[in-house]
Amino acid sequence: MQKGQIRVQTENIFPIIKKFLYSDHEIFLRELVSNAVDATQKIKTLSSIGEAKGELGELRIDVVLDPKEKTLSIIDRGVGMTAEEVDKYLNQVAFSGAEEFLTKYKDANIIGHFGLGFYSGFMVSSKVEVFTKSFREDAKGVYWSCDGSPEFELYEIDKADRGTRIVLHINEDSEEFLDGYRIRRILEKFCKFLPVAIYFKDESTKADDKEAKEEEESPINNTNPIWVKKPSELTNEDYQNFYRELYPAGETPLFWIHLNVDYPFNLTGILYFPKIKQSYEIQKDKIQLYSNQVFVTDEVKDIVPEFLMLLHGVIDSPDIPLNVSRSYLQGDPNVKKINAHITKKVADKLDEIFRNDRKSFEEKWESLGLFVKYGMMTDDKFLDKANKFLVMEDAADGVFYTLEEYKTAADTLQKNKEGKSVIIYTTDPVQQDAYIKAAQGKGYKVVKLETMVDAAFINNMEMKWDSVHFVRVDSDIADNLVDKQEHTDMVLSKEEEEKLKGLFGFKVSDLNLNVEVKGLSPDTPPVIATRPEFMRRMKDMAGMGGGMAAFYATMPDEVNLTVNGNHKVYQALLKESDTAKQEQQIRNLADLALLSQGLLKGANLTEFINRSVALLS
């Protein structure tokens, strides 16, 4: 029997392990089960090359909870350890590495691999015992124990089977881990896809609890998830079934991308494009990161480009650097390469679907558009590829145009005086119907840009697309949507024009009205209310938040009232001798225009209704 003290200055290491090293105490179980899996995989490898003799037996991992004894055991039939290996790996290597690291990076949040996974057990234990026997011929059983101080016990024991049993004596502060339901949930969370079968047994389960007993007889994990298989071996049904395994309540995904790279880095996984409805809250953090099938985290913003955080699925890579608890990503060149690779794979997949099955691509655009537009705003490499498959839907006939197709369809008709192509868009085809029809009457193409990201997308693309200018269909009268400096003659005299402008000089609460009399087509409405493009965009951006959001949100709405002096209604109105009636009719024309923009509310709307009834009486 050997008693001793770990041969480095370790008094400060255990408190750090217990309190600071791991962000979440429940991952102690992941670390210990992962070690058991590693030991099991090693014995399989050694057996296959003839270095481990004898029968392997059933290779499984058992997690056994005994609430009465306040112990949790992790048992494997892996390679095991000799007394020398126990001394080396448990008493020397881990601690010396930890001490060196902690001295150098005491205040840093970047923690490297130092074999401390085993010591995570001390976060929840008053004592840890190890019973182990190496696969080597003539190996003896070994017992090791430690109570969290630098002192340990190490001696030989009789042990029949190869492998390791770790017994955690759960401390008073951690008695939540004596709950069988809690342990099973932790195993399902972290070990769901480990490559060795894991069984969980709760000694407190009653003998007549058939359901619990059946659970104990089944492994908690799927040892062969589809992302470790070759894409050629899988069917669409396999991918859809795996999606349901990950997200039981989720709708069938639109499509998926199977990642399978082994050089210059290792990366496997499956990314799914979910259906997204604009009215539903979008959920991020749905991608799960694994390392050799061990769950690490669902916070993958450093690996997956931000615009793809809306995707669902699994990424598995042993080349992604993690801290000792496998919970925080470190800065690393591989991460950047993986990020770029995922972006390229997504862009290539979208381009492939667009080219090979455009009809299907357009049918999925309601969901895909959000990914594509967000990506174009945030990733220039993705932008270069996406310029070819971004599509915009015509508000009139539902035809989809790429950017170049829209430019061709609009031709010279929608080029302004600066030579830029003017993309006319609607954010609400129903409310803006009159403006859309007026624009279409001039031969213009109006497209729908009505999603939650479009306000930012429009501003962003105008900076990236030199030859394009966006104009909302209700931001000006149809004649002015494309600024060509063309004018229509006015039928009113200068004196009549000034008089008409004066009649529209009333005030409307909460609105700043700018009145202009113009000579438009006689078929154009008598009054058109529009909101200046710049101010409307600022209001849209304010709705999305940001530094100037509060400032623009409190500003009154700026509204341009364009009075069509060529409309026949004014010929009679200007001659009306009843001044009160004339003012009421003028005000009604203005209110109808404001109503079309959704700007007539509250008391102003009530007044309009009462006035309309009075005029009809």
Each language-model region and where it sits:
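GHKL/Bergerat-fold ATPase module in large chromosome/replication-associated machines
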Residues: I110, V128-E151, N171-S174, Y181-S617
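GHKL (Bergerat-fold) ATPase N-terminal catalytic module, capturing the glycine-rich phosphate-binding loop
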Residues: M1-F177, R185
